[in-house]
Amino acid sequence: MESRGTKREAGKIEVAEPRNKLPRPAPSLPTDPALYSGPFPFYRRPSELGCFSLDAQRQYHGDARALRYYSPPPTNGQSPNFDLRDGYPDRYQPRDEEVQERLDHLLRWLLEHRGQLEGGPGWLAGAIVTWRGHLTKLLTTPYERQEGWQLAASRFRGTLYLSEVETPAARVQRLTRPPLLRELMYMGYKFEQYMCADKPGVSPDPSGEVNTNVAFCSVLRSRLGNHPLLFSGEVDCTDPQAPSTQPPTCYVELKTSKEMHSPGQWKSFYRHKLLKWWAQSFLPGVPNVVAGFRNPEGFVCSLKTFPTMEMFEYVRNDRDGWNPSVCMNFCAAFLSFAQNTAVQDDPRLVYLFSWEPGGPVTVSEHRDAPHAFLPPWYVEAVTQDLPSPPKTPSPKD
């Protein structure tokens, strides 16, 4: 009788693999806030490299034509009384969310300007390129309890590109968005229309169409820990009266929120909404968030300015509050995790990082469609070292 684990064949004995040998576990990254409570990491003050605009048809323009100018109402103690429901839905042109733009617009800008980057192609080869919104999700992850995310990563010519992937749950949520939520989204854009003018020194004109295809985007350079960053984010407006007219310190972020009536409501606001506002504005160096508080009828009854660098003070003594150090340390840890995981230089290979609340960040590998996100026109231009796309790129390419 043969003993278990061996096989006799022509006088040759082969030793079988031990049955208790386990495959090496896939790498993962924990997200528990307690693991990231160390000192605040180094974060270089963001500097603006350039900008671009998207027009009413969502077409790219390498200039500031879509930039708007902050023009708040007079501070005479009266309620602004902005009707945020005005124009809905007849003067509303929402962006087609079925079009997955990925990094395309930012890559278009990068092709046009990569030769002008300080440090040249060598700097870009060690950098991480992404949208500001993707970094915002990373910052808030240790405190997020409801929504997961997926980030696709590809390495090409040394540069690591990060692009968000819509999760199945997020897609279902988007396609079944209730009418009230769609109206609340409109209200946020309508508030911007009341607070911004097309030219400095001119009053806002809220009678026009709200078209969410239009966007002005700033392109910024920074560094978190030892990770060089090049990222872009949409900017609501610039303040002509700001102490410094140098971007990004002249930019203003505009937000809306429901009116608060109790200390408990304010505490919840500081714990949850203010965290996201801080993360979104701290990353690009936007100094102020101006919030319009609306009543149940949809009218803005008050305005309040939240300086970005003072937001943490609202939760500093709250045991269940958030900590900027935790947010930034986790983001730095994720970037290290991504850099160490996405090691193969191949624009068609995607490392998909996935996270659900309560669990760690996990990773899986995929090749080509539907996960590959670096468009052929970009890969071709970079490979051939062309200064611009070989053809006019479209988000659908």
Curated annotation (Swiss-Prot):
It holds the Pfam family RAI1. Binds 2 magnesium ions. GO terms for molecular function: 5'-3' exonuclease activity; magnesium ion binding; mRNA 5'-diphosphatase activity; mRNA binding; nucleotide binding; RNA NAD+-cap (NAD+-forming) hydrolase activity. Its EC number is 3.6.1.-, 3.1.13.-. One of its GO terms (cellular component) is nucleus. It catalyses: a 5'-end triphospho-ribonucleoside in mRNA + H2O = a 5'-end phospho-ribonucleoside in mRNA + diphosphate + H(+); a 5'-end NAD(+)-phospho-ribonucleoside in mRNA + H2O = a 5'-end phospho-ribonucleoside in mRNA + NAD(+) + H(+); a 5'-end NAD(+)-phospho-ribonucleoside in snoRNA + H2O = a 5'-end phospho-ribonucleoside in snoRNA + NAD(+) + H(+); a 5'-end (N(7)-methyl 5'-triphosphoguanosine)-ribonucleoside-ribonucleotide in mRNA + H2O = a (N(7)-methyl 5'-triphosphoguanosine)-nucleoside + a 5'-end phospho-ribonucleoside in mRNA + H(+). Substrate binds at residues 58, 101, 131-133, 217, 234, 255, 280. InterPro entries: RAI1, RAI1-like_fam. It comes from the Eukaryota. Its cofactor is Mg(2+). Its main location: nucleus. Mg(2+) 2 binds at residues 192, 234, 236. Mg(2+) 1 binds at residues 192, 236, 253-254. It is found in: Nucleus. The modification Phosphoserine is found at residue 394. Residues 1-20 have a biased composition (Basic and acidic residues). GO terms for biological process: mRNA catabolic process; NAD-cap decapping; nuclear mRNA surveillance; nuclear-transcribed mRNA catabolic process; nucleic acid metabolic process; RNA destabilization. The modification Phosphothreonine is found at residue 392. The keyword Iron-sulfur does not apply. Residues 1-37, 67-88 are annotated as: Disordered. Keywords: Exonuclease, Hydrolase, Magnesium, Metal-binding, Nuclease, Nucleotide-binding, Nucleus, Phosphoprotein, RNA-binding. Belongs to the DXO/Dom3Z family. Decapping enzyme for NAD-capped RNAs: specifically hydrolyzes the nicotinamide adenine dinucleotide (NAD) cap from a subset of RNAs by removing the entire NAD moiety from the 5'-end of an NAD-capped RNA. The NAD-cap is present at the 5'-end of some RNAs and snoRNAs. In contrast to the canonical 5'-end N7 methylguanosine (m7G) cap, the NAD cap promotes mRNA decay. Preferentially acts on NAD-capped transcripts in response to environmental stress. PANTHER family: DECAPPING AND EXORIBONUCLEASE PROTEIN, DOM-3 RELATED. This is Decapping and exoribonuclease protein. It comes from Bos taurus (Bovine).
